[in-house]
Design a protein with these regions (language model features):
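NAD(P)H-binding glycine-rich loop region in Rossmannoid oxidoreductase-like domains
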Residues: 21-66, 71, 75-79, 92-95
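Glycine-rich "substrate-gating" loop/helix at the edge of Rossmann-like oxidoreductase active sites
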Residues: 111, 142-149, 170-180
Length: 193
């Protein structure tokens, strides 16, 4: 069985069981959702804030992406959840490399408040895993594309749709992309193995 959590009833998938969670922070109580739960797949977070109005963006990202994530993981560990799958970000690695793709051995070099908050969550999750029986899986996907993609990919898609020319011919920059379907398949593998 799968139980989802959404901020708003309109975001729920028809026919899917879910609970409404107003916020993701240190105060969020996950007890009901974690009853009889074996695996948590944590995809929620604060992201894609193109015109961020927060007085302190890093603190706003930390409240949700770091503290909210660690609160959920602590409650999951205390509830007997066996695995916690966390969708982090390739931004933890940095903004760019010198001609080589990022790899698992690269030192983290987050380039934005969002990426800093994700790295801090990763560090906290590893600490929770060390002192509990919770198995933690951290996924750092590159830009994810698919129907109604948010963030930079959604913005590029919008520019193309309305006819704004993109200067891609003059850019010497390589970026990795992954289809949402492939991310979902990988998460399914992480759940089963």
């Amino acid at each position: 069985d799968v139980l989802g959590s959404v901020r708003d009833r309109s975001l729920a998938i028809e026919g899917q069981d879910y609970i409404i969670v107003d916020s993701l922070d240190s105060e969020t109580e996950w007890g009901q959702a974690l009853e009889c739960c074996d695996v948590v797949v944590h995809l929620a977070g604060r992201a894609h804030m193109l015109n961020d109005e927060a007085a302190d963006p890093l603190e706003a990202f930390r409240r949700t992406n770091t503290i909210g994530t660690l609160n959920l993981a602590e409650q999951a560990a205390n509830s007997g959840v066996s695995r916690f799958i966390f969708l982090s970000s390739i931004g933890v690695n940095g903004a760019a490399t010198s001609g080589m793709p990022f790899n698992v051995y690269d030192s983290p070099s987050p380039h934005s408040p969002y990426a800093v908050s994700k790295l801090e969550a990763e560090i906290g999750l590893r600490a929770i895993a060390k002192r509990t029986s919770l198995d933690v899986v951290i996924i750092r996907p590159p830009a994810i594309y698919g129907k109604n993609a948010p963030g930079n990919f959604g913005l590029i898609e919008k520019f193309i749709r309305i006819g704004i020319p993109l200067p891609v011919g003059s850019i010497n920059n390589k970026r990795s992309l992954v289809a949402i379907e492939n991310v979902v398949s990988f998460i399914a593998v992480c759940i089963e193995h």
